[in-house]
Amino acid sequence: MNAVLRVRISAKQSKQKVIITAASRVTHTDKFNICGREAKKDATTVLDCSVISAIAKKYAAKRIETDNKADAWWPQLHSFAVGLKGAPDLIKAREVAHHIGTVHHEINYTVQEGLDAVRDVIYFIETYDITTVRASTPMYLLARVIKSMGIKMVLSGEGADEVFGGYLYFHKAPTPQAFHEETVRKLSKLHLYDCLRANKSLAAWGVEGRVPFLDKEFLDVAMRINPAVKMCPGKEIEKKVVREAFADILPQSVAWRQKEQFSDGVGYSWIDTLKAVTAAAVSDEQMAHAAERFPIHTPQNKEEYYYRTIFEEHFPSESAARSVPSVPSVACSTAEALAWDASFQGKNDPSGRAVAGVHEEAYKD
């Protein structure tokens, strides 16, 4: 194992080194592998991506050929953020870009543009999972812009929430052991959800996404951290380990900002409109007979029914339907974590706003 990864991770400097080692390995490799095009930063969940951006910016400033001694006049690090106008993630991504000095690109999409893309998105991501469809659509639209600029690769902050328990429902974890076991479950299912979204939404336009937080050596260290240190009981901020390690190189408004899931952070009206449109498109009678039409993983609400209908048009086989996970979830939890809090019982809402008493409304549409 790299010597850097053997240090004690309780110290702030050591935490930084572990993450920087993972990110630098990716960014250094990229400068040789992307045929002269710049490495770019895709701003999804702002805190996680901001950490990777700051590290990438550090290494992009020097020439590898001179062992990082000479300044690099080219390429410049570009950053990207996508969302509806006024979305909370756009505002914070803009702050980070200004703070670390990237060439920033802010891509606005309209709700109608998102709705028009849903059918194609479901085809490319090959799932009808509600959260994945919601979040993949803006990422798909973002990837189109990135590709149009001739860019081949982006870095992303995927995996940090799974490793450090960043989702808001983790506030309800009853014990360190339960917290750790849930992070393991989340990591084991990433290929069905967030990594599927990031990979296939980008690959639909020929863009490669790389994820330093899922670097194997980094995971080997991060998953050995005492889960009691990662926990965020009550109103304590989530992912405190990461925030403390990088608070000095990020804007404070970002370093200590509450988690917003990507599908929320791009604009709350995106999810609310999807719910309204699908509720109007699927009748009560159709829902009443959902089990007859879809005996495998029967849709539990109209939004899921709508996506499932499109999915079946693209992939009509039973094996395709079975390949998609279908379990109840609150704020992207696993089914096992629903036992953590009485308010979770009977709920099936993947939005972070579903965690009562924890989520603080970031803005109003």
Which residues fall in each region the model found?
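Conserved S-adenosyl-L-methionine
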Residues: 254-259
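ATP-dependent adenylate-handling active sites, centered on carboxylate activation for C-N bond formation
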Residues: 1-6, 10-11, 18-26, 30-250, ...
